[in-house]
Amino acid sequence: MLELEHRFRVVDVHARLNADAGGVQTRGRAISPDRLEREMHQAGVVRSVVFPGPREGGSYVSANNAVARRSVDRPFLAFARINGPRDPGERASSRLRNLAARRKDHHTSPEDVEQYAYDDRFHGFKLDPARDGLPDEETLDELEEVGLPVLVHGGEGFSPEAAEDALLSRSFPVVLAHFGGHPLNRDLMTEAIDLLERNDACYLDTSYVRYRDLLERAVMEHPDRVLFGSGAPSSHPNVAVMEVLTLDVPEDAMRKVFDKNARRVLGDSLPGDF
C-alpha cells in the first residue's frame, strides 16, 4: 500500500499485538511486529500503543511481558492487559455475583499493577471487562494510586453507562475505545460522547467508529478528549488515518486528535522531540 502524505504526526492509541505467535493476530492471518511497524510508518504513525490479544482464562503476565519485549527498539508503547473477578453486567444478578467474587491466582492483583507501573517497559493498561472481567476494588485502588491511563474496550458488553459506574469515579485517565460502541452501535457511541460532559478524566478513541457525523460531533464539541486509534491489525492504519483526515473539522482540532491529546494522556511516555 502506498504511503499516505499528510502534515500530521500521528500517535495511535489502539493496536493489538499477539504475544504467543510473535505477531499481530487478526482473523485468518498473522502480521509480524515488523510488518505492523511498516504499516504504521506508511500511515505516518510515529508511536503506537500495543497490547496483547485475548486469551481464554489464565494470567496475562507472560503475554504482557512478551509484548513489552517485542516493543523494544520499535515505536511501540506497551500497555499491560489486566483482568479481574467481577462481572461487568448491569443486571441485578451480576451485582449479586460480585458480592461474592474473589480474586483468583490468574487475576490481576494490586501487586501486579504496582509492578507494571514501575517497570519502564509499560506505559498504561488495557482492560476488556466483557471478556476478562473487572478488577476488584483493591486493584482499582492501586490503579488509581499509580495513575497510568487505562484503555477500556467499550461496547455492547460494557456500555458507557457501565464504564461510568465502575471506573469513572476514579482519578486515572480512562480512554473508552471504539467511542464506547463496539460493534458500530450508534446509540452507545452517542452515550459516550454525552459522557464527556460529566467526566473530565474520560477520553474516546476513534478505532472502528466509522460514523462520520459522530466523529465530527465529538471532535467539535470535545476537541481535547478524542484520541486517534487505528484498531490495527483489523483495520489498516492508512484507512483509519484517512477517516480522520476526511472529517470536516478545523486543522487544529485534527492535530489534537492525532497528536496533542495523546500527549496529554500518555505524558512522559512520549518524548517531546519525536
PLM segments and residue spans:
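Hydrophobic faces of well-ordered beta-strands that scaffold small-molecule active sites
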Residues: V10-A15, S48-V50, A78-R81, H123-L127, ...
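Generic structural signal for well-ordered alpha-helices
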Residues: P33-E37, N64-A68, P110-E114, L140, ...
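Catalytic pocket-lining loop regions of alpha/beta-barrel enzymes
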Residues: D132-F228
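Active-site gating/metal-coordination segments in enzymes
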Residues: V61-L151
